[in-house]
Curated annotation (Swiss-Prot):
Keyword line: Autocatalytic cleavage, Cell membrane, Developmental protein, Hydrolase, Membrane, Protease, Secreted, Signal
Signal sequence coordinates: 1-21
GO-annotated molecular function: peptidase activity
Site residues, Cleavage: 290-291
Protein name in UniProt: Warthog protein 1
GO biological process, any: segment polarity determination
Function of the protein: Intercellular signal essential for a variety of patterning events during development.
Region annotation (Disordered) ranges: 236-258
PROSITE patterns reported in the protein's UniProt record: INTEIN_N_TER (PS50817)
Length: 485
Protein backbone atom coordinates (compact mmCIF):
# COMPACT_ATOMS: atom_id res chain seq x y z
CA UNK A 1 0.00 0.00 0.00
CA UNK A 2 1.39 3.39 -1.06
CA UNK A 3 1.59 6.01 1.71
CA UNK A 4 1.36 9.63 0.59
CA UNK A 5 3.80 12.12 1.96
CA UNK A 6 2.01 14.45 4.45
CA UNK A 7 3.41 17.52 2.70
CA UNK A 8 2.13 16.29 -0.66
CA UNK A 9 -1.28 15.54 0.82
CA UNK A 10 -1.49 19.03 2.30
CA UNK A 11 -0.52 20.57 -1.03
CA UNK A 12 -3.12 18.55 -2.96
CA UNK A 13 -5.81 19.41 -0.43
CA UNK A 14 -4.99 23.08 -0.84
CA UNK A 15 -5.33 22.76 -4.60
CA UNK A 16 -8.67 20.99 -4.38
CA UNK A 17 -10.02 23.66 -2.06
CA UNK A 18 -9.03 26.47 -4.40
CA UNK A 19 -11.32 27.71 -7.15
CA UNK A 20 -10.09 26.49 -10.52
CA UNK A 21 -8.47 29.14 -12.70
CA UNK A 22 -7.19 29.03 -16.27
CA UNK A 23 -5.34 31.72 -18.22
CA UNK A 24 -4.06 31.83 -21.80
CA UNK A 25 -1.53 34.51 -20.88
CA UNK A 26 -0.41 37.40 -23.06
CA UNK A 27 0.75 35.16 -25.93
CA UNK A 28 -2.42 33.06 -26.15
CA UNK A 29 -5.89 33.52 -27.64
CA UNK A 30 -8.92 31.64 -26.25
CA UNK A 31 -10.42 29.58 -29.09
CA UNK A 32 -12.00 26.52 -27.46
CA UNK A 33 -14.52 26.19 -24.63
CA UNK A 34 -15.60 22.82 -23.28
CA UNK A 35 -17.92 21.92 -20.42
CA UNK A 36 -17.21 18.49 -18.99
CA UNK A 37 -20.14 16.27 -17.93
CA UNK A 38 -19.26 17.20 -14.35
CA UNK A 39 -19.87 20.87 -15.21
CA UNK A 40 -16.20 21.89 -15.11
CA UNK A 41 -15.35 24.39 -17.87
CA UNK A 42 -12.13 23.89 -19.84
CA UNK A 43 -10.43 26.69 -21.78
CA UNK A 44 -8.40 26.00 -24.92
CA UNK A 45 -5.70 28.52 -25.88
CA UNK A 46 -3.72 28.95 -29.07
CA UNK A 47 -1.12 31.24 -30.56
CA UNK A 48 -1.67 31.50 -34.34
CA UNK A 49 0.91 32.75 -36.81
CA UNK A 50 -0.45 36.29 -36.61
CA UNK A 51 -0.11 36.67 -32.85
CA UNK A 52 1.90 36.03 -29.72
CA UNK A 53 5.32 37.59 -30.22
CA UNK A 54 7.23 40.82 -29.71
CA UNK A 55 10.61 42.13 -30.86
CA UNK A 56 10.19 41.07 -34.46
CA UNK A 57 8.64 37.73 -33.63
CA UNK A 58 11.54 36.51 -31.52
CA UNK A 59 10.14 36.64 -28.00
CA UNK A 60 7.02 34.94 -26.72
CA UNK A 61 5.80 34.94 -23.15
CA UNK A 62 5.19 31.57 -21.59
CA UNK A 63 2.82 32.98 -18.98
CA UNK A 64 -0.23 30.79 -19.46
CA UNK A 65 -1.36 28.87 -16.39
CA UNK A 66 -3.84 26.09 -15.71
CA UNK A 67 -4.92 24.17 -12.64
CA UNK A 68 -5.44 20.42 -12.28
CA UNK A 69 -8.66 19.13 -10.79
CA UNK A 70 -10.49 15.85 -10.32
CA UNK A 71 -11.46 15.82 -14.02
CA UNK A 72 -8.10 17.00 -15.33
CA UNK A 73 -6.70 20.43 -16.17
CA UNK A 74 -9.08 23.35 -16.54
CA UNK A 75 -7.29 24.48 -19.69
CA UNK A 76 -4.56 23.76 -22.19
CA UNK A 77 -2.30 25.43 -24.75
CA UNK A 78 -2.07 23.99 -28.26
CA UNK A 79 1.10 21.96 -28.66
CA UNK A 80 3.74 23.56 -30.85
CA UNK A 81 2.22 27.04 -31.04
CA UNK A 82 4.78 28.73 -28.81
CA UNK A 83 7.66 26.92 -30.52
CA UNK A 84 6.67 28.02 -34.03
CA UNK A 85 9.21 30.22 -35.84
CA UNK A 86 7.76 33.63 -36.70
CA UNK A 87 9.29 35.66 -39.52
CA UNK A 88 8.67 39.37 -38.95
CA UNK A 89 10.48 42.62 -39.47
CA UNK A 90 12.78 43.42 -36.50
CA UNK A 91 10.93 46.71 -35.98
CA UNK A 92 7.46 45.19 -36.20
CA UNK A 93 5.17 46.05 -33.27
CA UNK A 94 4.45 43.48 -30.60
CA UNK A 95 1.47 41.18 -31.13
CA UNK A 96 0.55 40.49 -27.53
CA UNK A 97 -2.44 40.95 -25.30
CA UNK A 98 -2.41 43.06 -22.15
CA UNK A 99 -3.89 40.90 -19.40
CA UNK A 100 -4.61 41.98 -15.81
CA UNK A 101 -3.39 39.82 -12.97
CA UNK A 102 -6.83 39.61 -11.41
CA UNK A 103 -9.88 37.57 -12.44
CA UNK A 104 -12.28 40.29 -11.41
CA UNK A 105 -14.69 40.84 -14.32
CA UNK A 106 -18.17 39.38 -14.65
CA UNK A 107 -18.24 40.12 -18.39
CA UNK A 108 -15.76 41.06 -21.13
CA UNK A 109 -18.04 43.50 -22.94
CA UNK A 110 -15.32 45.79 -24.29
CA UNK A 111 -14.98 45.02 -28.05
CA UNK A 112 -11.20 45.31 -27.68
CA UNK A 113 -10.99 42.44 -25.17
CA UNK A 114 -11.34 38.68 -25.06
CA UNK A 115 -11.62 36.12 -22.27
CA UNK A 116 -7.96 35.55 -21.50
CA UNK A 117 -8.87 33.34 -18.55
CA UNK A 118 -11.43 32.54 -15.91
CA UNK A 119 -11.74 31.40 -12.32
CA UNK A 120 -14.60 28.94 -11.81
CA UNK A 121 -16.43 28.48 -8.53
CA UNK A 122 -18.18 25.30 -7.41
CA UNK A 123 -21.59 26.56 -8.57
CA UNK A 124 -20.33 27.34 -12.08
CA UNK A 125 -19.95 31.11 -11.68
CA UNK A 126 -17.03 32.53 -13.66
CA UNK A 127 -14.78 35.44 -12.75
CA UNK A 128 -13.19 36.53 -16.01
CA UNK A 129 -9.79 37.86 -16.94
CA UNK A 130 -10.43 40.32 -19.79
CA UNK A 131 -7.32 40.78 -21.95
CA UNK A 132 -6.99 43.84 -24.19
CA UNK A 133 -5.59 43.50 -27.73
CA UNK A 134 -5.33 46.24 -30.34
CA UNK A 135 -5.72 43.69 -33.14
CA UNK A 136 -9.42 43.42 -32.27
CA UNK A 137 -10.08 46.94 -33.55
CA UNK A 138 -11.62 45.66 -36.79
CA UNK A 139 -12.93 42.35 -35.43
CA UNK A 140 -16.58 41.36 -35.71
CA UNK A 141 -18.87 39.15 -33.67
CA UNK A 142 -19.89 36.07 -35.67
CA UNK A 143 -21.91 33.91 -33.29
CA UNK A 144 -23.03 33.01 -29.77
CA UNK A 145 -23.20 29.22 -29.38
CA UNK A 146 -24.50 27.79 -26.10
CA UNK A 147 -22.35 25.04 -24.56
CA UNK A 148 -23.96 22.58 -22.13
CA UNK A 149 -22.25 19.93 -19.97
CA UNK A 150 -20.77 17.30 -22.26
CA UNK A 151 -20.42 19.75 -25.15
CA UNK A 152 -17.57 21.72 -26.70
CA UNK A 153 -17.17 24.71 -29.00
CA UNK A 154 -13.96 25.13 -30.98
CA UNK A 155 -13.00 28.16 -33.08
CA UNK A 156 -9.49 28.89 -34.29
CA UNK A 157 -8.06 29.51 -37.74
CA UNK A 158 -10.45 30.55 -40.51
CA UNK A 159 -9.53 29.35 -43.99
CA UNK A 160 -10.92 30.67 -47.26
CA UNK A 161 -9.93 28.80 -50.41
CA UNK A 162 -7.20 27.08 -48.44
CA UNK A 163 -5.69 30.32 -47.13
CA UNK A 164 -5.74 31.54 -43.55
CA UNK A 165 -7.55 34.86 -43.27
CA UNK A 166 -8.84 35.08 -39.72
CA UNK A 167 -9.06 33.60 -36.26
CA UNK A 168 -12.22 32.99 -34.23
CA UNK A 169 -11.63 33.92 -30.60
CA UNK A 170 -13.84 33.69 -27.52
CA UNK A 171 -14.51 37.27 -26.49
CA UNK A 172 -17.02 36.64 -23.71
CA UNK A 173 -18.59 33.83 -21.67
CA UNK A 174 -21.91 34.13 -19.86
CA UNK A 175 -23.38 31.60 -17.45
CA UNK A 176 -26.96 30.51 -18.16
CA UNK A 177 -29.08 28.69 -15.57
CA UNK A 178 -32.26 26.93 -16.72
CA UNK A 179 -35.40 26.41 -14.65
CA UNK A 180 -34.29 22.96 -13.52
CA UNK A 181 -30.96 24.33 -12.28
CA UNK A 182 -28.89 23.07 -15.22
CA UNK A 183 -25.92 25.32 -15.97
CA UNK A 184 -24.78 26.16 -19.51
CA UNK A 185 -22.56 28.87 -20.98
CA UNK A 186 -23.20 31.29 -23.83
CA UNK A 187 -19.94 31.84 -25.70
CA UNK A 188 -19.46 35.00 -27.77
CA UNK A 189 -17.25 34.35 -30.80
CA UNK A 190 -15.37 37.22 -32.43
CA UNK A 191 -13.50 36.95 -35.72
CA UNK A 192 -10.28 38.92 -35.99
CA UNK A 193 -8.07 39.41 -39.03
CA UNK A 194 -5.23 36.89 -38.90
CA UNK A 195 -3.03 36.79 -41.98
CA UNK A 196 0.03 34.54 -41.59
CA UNK A 197 3.48 36.08 -41.65
CA UNK A 198 5.50 35.60 -44.86
CA UNK A 199 7.66 32.53 -45.20
CA UNK A 200 10.79 34.55 -45.89
CA UNK A 201 12.49 37.53 -44.27
CA UNK A 202 12.80 39.54 -47.50
CA UNK A 203 11.91 39.43 -51.18
CA UNK A 204 12.93 41.41 -54.22
CA UNK A 205 10.63 44.23 -55.28
CA UNK A 206 10.73 46.84 -58.00
CA UNK A 207 12.09 50.26 -57.08
CA UNK A 208 10.47 52.05 -60.05
CA UNK A 209 7.65 53.44 -57.91
CA UNK A 210 6.29 55.90 -60.48
CA UNK A 211 6.06 53.20 -63.14
CA UNK A 212 4.31 50.77 -60.80
CA UNK A 213 1.77 53.34 -59.60
CA UNK A 214 1.12 54.33 -63.20
CA UNK A 215 0.45 50.73 -64.17
CA UNK A 216 -2.05 50.36 -61.31
CA UNK A 217 -3.88 53.56 -62.26
CA UNK A 218 -3.97 52.48 -65.90
CA UNK A 219 -5.44 49.16 -64.82
CA UNK A 220 -8.15 50.94 -62.81
CA UNK A 221 -8.99 53.09 -65.81
CA UNK A 222 -9.21 50.07 -68.10
CA UNK A 223 -11.44 48.27 -65.60
CA UNK A 224 -13.84 51.21 -65.31
CA UNK A 225 -13.89 51.72 -69.10
CA UNK A 226 -14.72 48.07 -69.73
CA UNK A 227 -17.82 48.34 -67.56
CA UNK A 228 -16.70 46.14 -64.69
CA UNK A 229 -19.23 46.44 -61.86
CA UNK A 230 -17.81 47.83 -58.65
CA UNK A 231 -19.33 47.57 -55.20
CA UNK A 232 -20.67 50.76 -53.62
CA UNK A 233 -20.10 50.79 -49.87
CA UNK A 234 -22.31 53.28 -48.07
CA UNK A 235 -21.50 54.80 -44.72
CA UNK A 236 -22.20 52.56 -41.72
CA UNK A 237 -23.30 49.71 -43.99
CA UNK A 238 -22.25 46.37 -42.55
CA UNK A 239 -23.12 42.75 -43.20
CA UNK A 240 -23.53 40.46 -40.21
CA UNK A 241 -23.62 36.64 -40.35
CA UNK A 242 -27.39 36.78 -39.98
CA UNK A 243 -27.87 39.25 -42.85
CA UNK A 244 -29.78 37.91 -45.84
CA UNK A 245 -27.45 38.09 -48.83
CA UNK A 246 -28.62 37.72 -52.40
CA UNK A 247 -26.58 36.05 -55.11
CA UNK A 248 -25.74 39.49 -56.53
CA UNK A 249 -23.90 41.49 -53.88
CA UNK A 250 -24.07 44.76 -55.85
CA UNK A 251 -25.78 47.54 -53.90
CA UNK A 252 -27.47 50.13 -56.10
CA UNK A 253 -27.51 53.67 -54.69
CA UNK A 254 -30.92 55.30 -54.42
CA UNK A 255 -31.65 58.10 -56.85
CA UNK A 256 -34.37 59.88 -54.87
CA UNK A 257 -32.22 62.50 -53.18
CA UNK A 258 -28.64 63.53 -53.86
CA UNK A 259 -26.35 61.88 -51.35
CA UNK A 260 -22.76 62.27 -50.40
CA UNK A 261 -20.33 60.64 -52.82
CA UNK A 262 -19.74 57.01 -51.98
CA UNK A 263 -16.38 55.36 -52.04
CA UNK A 264 -15.64 52.82 -54.76
CA UNK A 265 -13.44 49.82 -54.14
CA UNK A 266 -11.87 48.22 -57.20
CA UNK A 267 -9.91 45.01 -56.89
CA UNK A 268 -6.85 45.40 -59.10
CA UNK A 269 -4.93 42.47 -60.52
CA UNK A 270 -7.48 39.78 -59.70
CA UNK A 271 -10.45 38.56 -61.67
CA UNK A 272 -13.96 38.94 -60.35
CA UNK A 273 -15.01 35.56 -58.94
CA UNK A 274 -18.75 34.81 -59.05
CA UNK A 275 -20.70 33.04 -56.31
CA UNK A 276 -20.40 29.27 -56.76
CA UNK A 277 -24.15 28.70 -56.93
CA UNK A 278 -26.49 31.63 -57.42
CA UNK A 279 -28.96 32.02 -54.61
CA UNK A 280 -26.86 30.39 -51.89
CA UNK A 281 -25.17 32.20 -49.05
CA UNK A 282 -22.94 30.20 -46.75
CA UNK A 283 -21.59 31.88 -43.59
CA UNK A 284 -18.15 30.37 -44.12
CA UNK A 285 -16.70 29.29 -40.78
CA UNK A 286 -18.79 31.95 -39.08
CA UNK A 287 -18.14 30.63 -35.61
CA UNK A 288 -20.18 27.51 -36.39
CA UNK A 289 -18.42 24.19 -36.86
CA UNK A 290 -18.78 21.92 -39.89
CA UNK A 291 -21.11 19.08 -38.96
CA UNK A 292 -24.21 17.00 -39.66
CA UNK A 293 -27.73 17.66 -38.37
CA UNK A 294 -29.07 15.93 -35.29
CA UNK A 295 -31.64 14.12 -37.46
CA UNK A 296 -28.99 12.55 -39.70
CA UNK A 297 -29.11 8.77 -39.44
CA UNK A 298 -26.31 6.22 -39.09
CA UNK A 299 -26.54 2.44 -38.95
CA UNK A 300 -25.35 0.53 -35.87
CA UNK A 301 -25.34 -3.24 -35.21
CA UNK A 302 -28.53 -2.68 -33.17
CA UNK A 303 -30.25 -0.72 -35.94
CA UNK A 304 -30.64 2.86 -37.13
CA UNK A 305 -29.68 5.69 -34.78
CA UNK A 306 -29.88 9.48 -35.14
CA UNK A 307 -26.76 11.60 -34.81
CA UNK A 308 -28.20 13.31 -31.71
CA UNK A 309 -28.46 9.93 -29.94
CA UNK A 310 -24.98 8.75 -30.90
CA UNK A 311 -22.39 8.22 -28.16
CA UNK A 312 -18.64 7.76 -28.01
CA UNK A 313 -17.91 4.04 -28.28
CA UNK A 314 -20.88 3.27 -30.56
CA UNK A 315 -20.17 1.20 -33.66
CA UNK A 316 -21.42 2.77 -36.90
CA UNK A 317 -21.44 1.51 -40.47
CA UNK A 318 -18.77 2.55 -42.95
CA UNK A 319 -17.13 1.25 -46.12
CA UNK A 320 -13.66 -0.22 -45.78
CA UNK A 321 -11.56 -2.57 -47.94
CA UNK A 322 -14.30 -3.05 -50.50
CA UNK A 323 -17.09 -4.01 -48.12
CA UNK A 324 -19.49 -2.66 -45.52
CA UNK A 325 -18.17 -2.87 -41.97
CA UNK A 326 -18.49 -1.10 -38.60
CA UNK A 327 -16.16 1.44 -37.06
CA UNK A 328 -16.04 2.86 -33.54
CA UNK A 329 -16.94 6.47 -32.71
CA UNK A 330 -13.69 7.59 -31.08
CA UNK A 331 -14.63 11.15 -30.12
CA UNK A 332 -16.68 14.20 -30.97
CA UNK A 333 -15.17 16.97 -33.05
CA UNK A 334 -18.27 19.04 -32.24
CA UNK A 335 -21.53 18.33 -30.44
CA UNK A 336 -23.65 21.47 -30.01
CA UNK A 337 -27.40 20.71 -29.86
CA UNK A 338 -28.41 24.38 -29.37
CA UNK A 339 -26.25 25.95 -32.08
CA UNK A 340 -27.97 27.12 -35.27
CA UNK A 341 -26.14 26.64 -38.57
CA UNK A 342 -26.64 26.70 -42.33
CA UNK A 343 -26.87 23.27 -43.96
CA UNK A 344 -26.75 22.02 -47.54
CA UNK A 345 -29.24 19.36 -48.60
CA UNK A 346 -28.06 17.05 -51.40
CA UNK A 347 -30.73 14.85 -53.00
CA UNK A 348 -29.65 12.00 -55.28
CA UNK A 349 -31.47 10.31 -58.15
CA UNK A 350 -31.26 7.07 -56.19
CA UNK A 351 -33.34 8.71 -53.44
CA UNK A 352 -30.71 9.20 -50.74
CA UNK A 353 -30.67 12.63 -49.05
CA UNK A 354 -27.83 13.96 -46.91
CA UNK A 355 -27.60 17.23 -44.94
CA UNK A 356 -24.29 18.78 -43.89
CA UNK A 357 -22.73 22.18 -43.35
CA UNK A 358 -21.03 23.81 -46.37
CA UNK A 359 -17.44 23.08 -45.35
CA UNK A 360 -17.89 19.45 -44.35
CA UNK A 361 -16.13 16.98 -46.63
CA UNK A 362 -17.96 14.43 -48.72
CA UNK A 363 -16.69 11.85 -51.19
CA UNK A 364 -17.25 13.05 -54.76
CA UNK A 365 -17.00 10.28 -57.36
CA UNK A 366 -15.77 10.63 -60.92
CA UNK A 367 -18.91 9.82 -62.89
CA UNK A 368 -16.85 7.78 -65.40
CA UNK A 369 -14.08 6.09 -63.43
CA UNK A 370 -15.79 6.10 -59.99
CA UNK A 371 -12.52 7.40 -58.51
CA UNK A 372 -13.31 9.31 -55.30
CA UNK A 373 -11.94 12.55 -53.85
CA UNK A 374 -12.83 14.65 -50.82
CA UNK A 375 -14.52 17.97 -51.60
CA UNK A 376 -16.53 20.51 -49.61
CA UNK A 377 -20.28 19.97 -49.64
CA UNK A 378 -20.70 23.52 -50.93
CA UNK A 379 -18.65 22.61 -54.04
CA UNK A 380 -21.00 19.80 -55.07
CA UNK A 381 -23.34 20.69 -57.94
CA UNK A 382 -26.30 19.08 -59.66
CA UNK A 383 -25.01 16.32 -61.92
CA UNK A 384 -22.04 15.46 -59.72
CA UNK A 385 -21.76 11.88 -58.51
CA UNK A 386 -21.84 10.45 -54.98
CA UNK A 387 -21.42 6.94 -53.61
CA UNK A 388 -24.45 5.58 -51.77
CA UNK A 389 -25.15 2.33 -49.95
CA UNK A 390 -27.22 -0.25 -51.78
CA UNK A 391 -27.55 -3.61 -50.04
CA UNK A 392 -23.99 -4.41 -48.93
CA UNK A 393 -22.03 -2.34 -51.44
CA UNK A 394 -21.51 1.21 -52.67
CA UNK A 395 -23.07 2.28 -55.95
CA UNK A 396 -22.71 5.54 -57.82
CA UNK A 397 -25.58 7.98 -58.25
CA UNK A 398 -25.92 11.60 -59.37
CA UNK A 399 -27.14 14.65 -57.47
CA UNK A 400 -30.56 15.75 -58.69
CA UNK A 401 -31.27 18.61 -56.27
CA UNK A 402 -29.29 20.98 -54.06
CA UNK A 403 -30.74 23.40 -51.52
CA UNK A 404 -29.82 25.18 -48.31
CA UNK A 405 -31.62 25.60 -45.00
CA UNK A 406 -31.03 26.52 -41.34
CA UNK A 407 -31.42 24.13 -38.43
CA UNK A 408 -30.48 24.01 -34.75
CA UNK A 409 -28.07 21.28 -33.65
CA UNK A 410 -24.65 20.47 -35.12
CA UNK A 411 -22.91 17.11 -34.68
CA UNK A 412 -19.51 15.93 -35.93
CA UNK A 413 -18.46 12.46 -34.71
CA UNK A 414 -14.94 11.22 -35.36
CA UNK A 415 -14.69 7.52 -36.17
CA UNK A 416 -11.55 5.41 -36.04
CA UNK A 417 -11.54 5.11 -39.84
CA UNK A 418 -12.33 8.78 -40.52
CA UNK A 419 -15.48 8.09 -42.53
CA UNK A 420 -18.98 6.68 -42.13
CA UNK A 421 -22.29 6.06 -43.90
CA UNK A 422 -24.75 8.89 -43.14
CA UNK A 423 -28.29 8.61 -44.52
CA UNK A 424 -26.97 5.90 -46.88
CA UNK A 425 -24.34 8.30 -48.32
CA UNK A 426 -20.61 7.68 -47.97
CA UNK A 427 -19.20 10.74 -46.16
CA UNK A 428 -16.12 11.89 -44.28
CA UNK A 429 -15.83 12.76 -40.60
CA UNK A 430 -13.53 15.64 -41.44
CA UNK A 431 -14.25 19.34 -41.84
CA UNK A 432 -11.79 21.92 -43.22
CA UNK A 433 -8.99 19.32 -43.00
CA UNK A 434 -8.77 16.49 -45.54
CA UNK A 435 -5.84 14.51 -44.20
CA UNK A 436 -7.26 11.18 -43.12
CA UNK A 437 -4.53 8.63 -42.46
CA UNK A 438 -2.05 11.03 -40.88
CA UNK A 439 -4.58 12.77 -38.66
CA UNK A 440 -5.97 9.46 -37.41
CA UNK A 441 -2.52 8.16 -36.59
CA UNK A 442 -2.08 11.21 -34.40
CA UNK A 443 -5.64 10.99 -33.02
CA UNK A 444 -5.19 7.39 -31.90
CA UNK A 445 -1.86 8.19 -30.28
CA UNK A 446 -3.18 11.26 -28.46
CA UNK A 447 -6.30 9.44 -27.28
CA UNK A 448 -4.18 6.60 -25.91
CA UNK A 449 -1.94 9.03 -24.05
CA UNK A 450 -4.94 10.89 -22.63
CA UNK A 451 -6.52 7.67 -21.37
CA UNK A 452 -3.30 6.66 -19.64
CA UNK A 453 -3.03 10.09 -18.02
CA UNK A 454 -6.58 9.81 -16.73
CA UNK A 455 -5.85 6.44 -15.17
CA UNK A 456 -2.75 7.85 -13.48
CA UNK A 457 -4.70 10.84 -12.17
CA UNK A 458 -7.48 8.58 -10.93
CA UNK A 459 -10.19 10.01 -13.20
CA UNK A 460 -12.02 7.36 -15.19
CA UNK A 461 -14.72 9.65 -16.53
CA UNK A 462 -14.88 9.75 -20.32
CA UNK A 463 -15.68 13.23 -21.63
CA UNK A 464 -16.19 12.00 -25.17
CA UNK A 465 -14.49 14.95 -26.83
CA UNK A 466 -11.53 15.42 -29.09
CA UNK A 467 -8.19 15.36 -27.23
CA UNK A 468 -6.60 18.80 -27.05
CA UNK A 469 -3.46 17.82 -28.97
CA UNK A 470 -5.54 16.31 -31.76
CA UNK A 471 -7.68 19.45 -31.97
CA UNK A 472 -4.53 21.44 -32.67
CA UNK A 473 -3.24 18.90 -35.18
CA UNK A 474 -6.49 18.80 -37.14
CA UNK A 475 -6.62 22.60 -37.26
CA UNK A 476 -3.16 23.08 -38.79
CA UNK A 477 -2.61 19.98 -40.94
CA UNK A 478 -4.24 21.64 -43.94
CA UNK A 479 -1.43 24.18 -43.86
CA UNK A 480 1.28 21.53 -43.56
CA UNK A 481 0.07 19.24 -46.35
CA UNK A 482 -0.76 20.09 -49.98
CA UNK A 483 -4.41 20.02 -51.05
CA UNK A 484 -3.69 17.41 -53.71
CA UNK A 485 -1.85 14.27 -52.70
Amino acid sequence: MMVMNPLTATFLAALIGTAASASCGSSGIPFRFEVLPSGQPVLGCGSPTCFGAENGGRDLRHDSSFMAGADGDDGFFRDGDLARVRVRDPDAPAQMANCPREFSSSSCSNPMTWVGGFKASDNGDLSLQCCHYEGLRFAQEVGRPVVHPGEVYSGGEVLRDGRQTGFDAISNVRKITSGDGTVAYEVTVTRMNCLPNPGEESNEVSFDIQRDIGRILDKVGETAASGVQTNHIEADQRLSPSTDVQSDSYVSPTEADPQEPVEQFVQVGEQVVPVTSAGYYYPVASGVPACFTGNSKVMTPAGEKSMADLSVGDMVMTYEYGKMTYTRVASWLHRLPDTKAAFIKLTTEQGAIIDMTPQHFIYKANCVTEEMELVYAEDMTIGDCLMVKENEKLVMTTISEKSTFYETGVYAPMTETGDLIVDDVYASCHNVVKANTLSHTFLNFATSVQQKMRSVLGSLEETGHLPATSEFFLNIIDVLLPHKY
